From Swiss-Prot:
Disordered as annotated region, ranges: 124-169, 292-316
Task of the protein: Part of the small subunit (SSU) processome, first precursor of the small eukaryotic ribosomal subunit. During the assembly of the SSU processome in the nucleolus, many ribosome biogenesis factors, an RNA chaperone and ribosomal proteins associate with the nascent pre-rRNA and work in concert to generate RNA folding, modifications, rearrangements and cleavage as well as targeted degradation of pre-ribosomal RNA by the RNA exosome. Its dissociation from the complex determines the transition from state pre-A1 to state pre-A1*. May inhibit mRNA translation.
Protein name (record): Neuroguidin-B
Comp. bias (Acidic residues): 145-156
Coiled coil: none
InterPro entries: Sas10/Utp3/C1D
PANTHER family: NEUROGUIDIN, SOMETHING ABOUT SILENCING PROTEIN 10-RELATED
Amino acid sequence: AAAGDVILEDVPGSVNLFNTLQDQITKVTAHVQDLTQKVRSSIYNTDKGLSFLELKDQLLLFYLQDLTHLMLEKTNGKSIKGNPGILRLVELRTVLEKMRPIDQKLKYQIDKLVKAAVTGSLGENDPLRFKPNPQNLMSKLSEPDERESDSGEEGAEGGVAKKPQSKVKRYIPPRLAPVHYDDTEAEREHRIVERAKKLALSSSTIRELKEQYSDAPEEIREGRAYHMMRHDKEEQHRINHEESMMVRLNMTRKEKARKKRVLSMTSQLNSLTHFSDISALTGGEGRAEDMVPFMKKSKKGPKKSKKKKGFSRRRH
């Protein structure tokens, strides 16, 4: 009796569901017939479609067919136990679930293609609108040469027949005239002051003040000078490069002089009372040339001609 009451309560809902289902089936059937007619009349071109969407449509169609078959069996009061349609539904559902991540990745491209097919143009904010124009990559060699045209006109005036111009022209590189760099005195002083500030920030005095007043943990180093540590680092890098590339690097005259100067600094005691110049950071006044040490001034003047002295013959 209780089971009969449950069935009677479900009857009105089932009837409404069947009526709604019948209306939906009628609309879907009309829509599918309309699309089929347009495809057969070549209104919609489906030759170059996406195989992924075609596979998805076929799987959904098979899924609906098996589901409809099982609903028909249950409506007729038959048992669906052991029905092969259940295994097919599980398999199709698994494949459709596995295809969902691929569908999400292709969603942007599919929407863009559909929008371009409907509107006939890309969107205003589409990144492909800002791609390079291939027409700008056309060779300029096919353009008429001005010099050849001028020479052709002069030949025509002189009575000489003008030769037909060939399509392939000779490439003429543009002529670039050297321009002198005008460096004012203010710009030169500003550049020297900036260099002095950079050297002052990397000096040992600023580094020691930073270590003294900084809250960071103190870094314990070997008791060696900073210039020696830098020299050892460069030398180790040089050795590693020579060993890895199996080649010997030749030192220039400038590098040899710098190495000799660095090695000689360790044996000199004259620099004990020499502190780094940080006047560029404190706003000290003075010439810009005095702020940057070790600046060699080039001497401009007439070069003396070197003439070999030979022995003069003495006549007897």
